[in-house]
Amino acid sequence: MKTITYRRGELLSLGQAYLKAVIQRFMEAKLTTEKAIEQLSESELFWSPDEESNSIAIIIKHMSGNMVSRWTQFFTTDGEKPDRNRDDEFVGDLKKKEQVMELWNIGWNTFLSALKDINEDQLLKTITIRNEPHSVIEAIERQMYHYSYHVGQIVYIAKHLKSSDWQSLTIPRKK
């Protein structure tokens, strides 16, 4: 098996390097979101610009539902679990920041635990999501897109709400 030199001189196979990279990127997305949420008051977490738009709390509820459904018994069951009520994920029934963050942590713990258990020999294995076959790589990349989409929404809403009080999560613009 061909190896590549990864950061800090580690010798890894391509599959090992891929898994290490995606785990790192997902953890960065999680941390970025948490840094945005830390800047918000409880009421800001539940703010929505209109009835058709989702609050950060609802986006988090949806992400958690998706993570738990997709990554529980990942190799042996369809990623869309029969007990998942996706529509309920968009109901604003959470009232406290602690409830939101509990769901956030349940989702991420489920997802990252499953992701860390994948080995390179499983990357081309076929799994199903909504009765459609996907390789494990495709499933990971599907989630990379989905979670990044929602992380962007969360950060954008948080930045809008904080306005001039926003603390940049990356390199700030020069003023």
Which functions belong to the PLM regions below?
Residues 9-23, 91-92, 99:
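Short, charged, low-complexity loops and linkers
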Residues 91-127, 138-147:
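Acidic/histidine-rich alpha-helical segments that form the ligand environment
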Residues 2-12, 23-27, 34, 42-87, ...:
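Short, contiguous alpha-helical
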